[in-house]
Structures are given as structure tokens and as C-alpha cells.
């Protein structure tokens, strides 16, 4: 499984973190398979960070290959959703941002992406709302 994540997409949280810049393009980052934490397994705080933050996320399972999909066809490319928790080593992230370095170490460490059980989209009356 590949995790493609969109960062900086919640304006209120961006303000809480002191970010005033409005992004016109999405901030994309990836998480490796080893980041996935499933089936009620415990999360252990890593020893390389003194500041682990967490955010609740909507997780969408992509079920078809595609590229540059028009928004009106997007619903054809996913089949299930769940809730997840994105853990971030915030102290490292600040340092990496200042140095303009990638986020992998602060976002993609082992067990940094807790995900629930996927629920088929048919179980929801209006998945867009």
C-alpha cells in the first residue's frame, strides 16, 4: 500500500501552527508501508523526537490506476474510506522546513500512520458531504 498525503490543507490548523501563507498548490508527501499501523496495534513514541503531534485524517482507498483525473470522475477511483491518525515529529518538521529539506523523517517514521478498518463507500448516502 502506498500512502499519498496532502499537507497544509486545513486552514484553521495552519493558523494554529503559525502559517499565514495560502498554498495555491497542494503540499504532497508520501509515507512508506512501514508507517502503517493497523489492527489496534500500539503506537510507541519514537526516541528521536521530543514533540510528537497527531492529526485526525480522512483516509481514502484508491482502487484504480489513473492520472490527472477530472474532479467529476474522481468517485470512480476510490471504493472505501476510513479514519486515520497522522503522527508528526513536529520538532524535526520545523527544522526540516527551515532547511528546505523533505519531510520523510518527521512524517514517515514506523507506525506514523494509524488507520482504521475501511468501509465501502456504498455504506454512505452522500460521501461528498
What is the role of each PLM region?
Residues 1-129:
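Catalytic-core "active-site belt" of small-molecule-metabolizing enzymes
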Amino acid at each position: 500500500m502506498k500512502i499519498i498525503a496532502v499537507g497544509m490543507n486545513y486552514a484553521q490548523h495552519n493558523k494554529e501552527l503559525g502559517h499565514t501563507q495560502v498554498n495555491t498548490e497542494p503540499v504532497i508527501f508520501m509515507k512508506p508501508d512501514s508507517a502503517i499501523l493497523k489492527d489496534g496495534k500500539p503506537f510507541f513514541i519514537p526516541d528521536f523526537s521530543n514533540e510528537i503531534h497527531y492529526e485526525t485524517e480522512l483516509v481514502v482507498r484508491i482502487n484504480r490506476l489513473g492520472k490527472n483525473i477530472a474532479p467529476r470522475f474522481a468517485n470512480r477511483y476510490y471504493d472505501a474510506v476510513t479514519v486515520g491518525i497522522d503522527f508528526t515529529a513536529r520538532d524535526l518538521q520545523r527544522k526540516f522546513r527551515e532547511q528546505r529539506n523533505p519531510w520523510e523523517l518527521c512524517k514517515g517514521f514506523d507506525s506514523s500512520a494509524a488507520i482504521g478498518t475501511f468501509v465501502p463507500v456504498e455504506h454512505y448516502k452522500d460521501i461528498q458531504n
